[in-house]
């Protein structure tokens, strides 16, 4: 297992990459997943980071954890810009990191689920200016906070 680190619009990202691509017979690439921990946009829950990422790595994914902005730094679509940039970077470096560029998923818990769902529907928002390169191919929403009004989470 190889570890890579990079920044996505200043958000630290760590990736867990399989380094056995030379031994793969059929495909030399793997699907990728970006994990977004929850924490009410106040913090990032440790139990929704490495344990989840390592489980997906065990299932054969190239796995990435993004420490998106929280607290006062989370305004003005900043976490969304960071996650969008992360997906774009995975596509740009797909060959180098042996990623299937058409199989990039984003998974999020709670506030991270909100962020994940937001990218799923707002990937083409003019403020992102990244086009389809930041569109995830799949979303995994784990108890996301996405309901407002009368039925909102309290």
Regions found by a protein language model. Give the residues of each.
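Short beta-to-alpha linker loops that shape the active-site pocket of alpha/beta-hydrolase fold enzymes
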Residues: 39, 62, 67-71, 145
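Hydrophobic/aromatic beta-strand patches that form the interior of the parallel beta-sheet core
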Residues: 4, 34, 64, 140-142
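N-terminal carbohydrate-binding/catalytic regions of secreted carbohydrate-active enzymes
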Residues: 17, 29, 44-48
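Catalytic nucleophile-loop/oxyanion-hole region of alpha/beta-hydrolase
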Residues: 45-46, 66-101
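N-terminal cap/lid segment of alpha/beta-hydrolase-fold proteins
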Residues: 1-28, 80, 150, 154
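Primarily recognizes the serine-hydrolase "nucleophile elbow" in alpha/beta-hydrolase
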Residues: 85-154
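Short amphipathic alpha-helix adjacent to the substrate-entry channel of hydrolases
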Residues: 46-64
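Short beta-strand element of the alpha/beta-hydrolase
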Residues: 29-38
């Amino acid at each position: 297992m190889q570890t890579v680190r990079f920044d996505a619009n200043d958000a630290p990202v760590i990736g867990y990459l399989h380094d056995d691509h030379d031994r793969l017979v059929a495909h030399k690439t793997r699907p990728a997943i970006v994990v977004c921990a929850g924490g009410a946009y106040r913090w990032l829950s440790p139990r929704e980071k490495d344990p989840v990422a390592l489980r997906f790595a065990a299932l054969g994914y190239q796995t990435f954890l993004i420490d998106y902005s929280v607290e006062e730094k989370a305004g003005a679509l900043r976490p969304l810009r960071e996650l969008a940039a992360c997906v774009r970077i995975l596509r740009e470096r797909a060959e180098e990191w042996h990623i299937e560029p058409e199989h990039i998923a984003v998974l999020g818990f709670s506030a991270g689920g909100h962020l994940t769902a937001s990218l799923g529907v707002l990937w083409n928002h003019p403020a992102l200016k990244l086009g389809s390169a930041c569109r995830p191919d799949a979303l995994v929403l784990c108890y996301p906070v996405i309901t407002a009004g009368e039925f909102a989470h309290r």
